[in-house]
Amino acid sequence: MSPKSSKVAGIDLAGSERRATGFCLLEGNRARVSVLHTDEEILRAVGKGVRAAAIDAPLSLPRGRCCLKDDCPCVGKAHFRVCDLELRRMGIKFFPITLGPMRQLTLRGLRLKEKLESRGIEVFETYPGAAQDIWGIPRQKNPQGLKRGLSRFKVGGSWPRPDVTKDELDALTCALVARDYLRGITMAIGDPEEGLMVLPKTGKRLEV
């Protein structure tokens, strides 16, 4: 199966199963998006045949950290990963993983990664806000602008509907990064021993 026709998943993960997670299954130029909640729903939606999954959630801890607990001796270690610092150098805004709500998201992301990898799926972290910045299209704060920007990829399917959510648009962004990853046209930032983040190659701006 060629990378062009391979099936990939994009997951805009929420920190809690009570909140909406955006999900996208992308095969070739057809995308199916939905809003899910539980890990079980996500695993069921991934189904079979997915080669790669890109998740919008931290999937590694800063060097020297064994956990994100405040009462652990490791709390005095690093608060930023190398990939986080590289985002900062690129001028891309992000939330540090030691920030309150991000801790829960990180732990959920790590659990989901393990479950997906047990199925033989290649799983990696991405950041749709960074991808959108690199492509030169609006972030989800401007959903109509983001929708117009993503339409430049000429992807059909269920996602262009009028009531598509911000989470689903970010999930589609993640899936597009996963597809580009299989095509060998992405870059990885960070420290391989600590954890990498996969993003579009810089200079790939779109005309919006």
Please identify what each model-predicted range represents.
Residues 1-208:
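Phosphate- and other anionic-substrate recognition elements at nucleic-acid/protein interfaces
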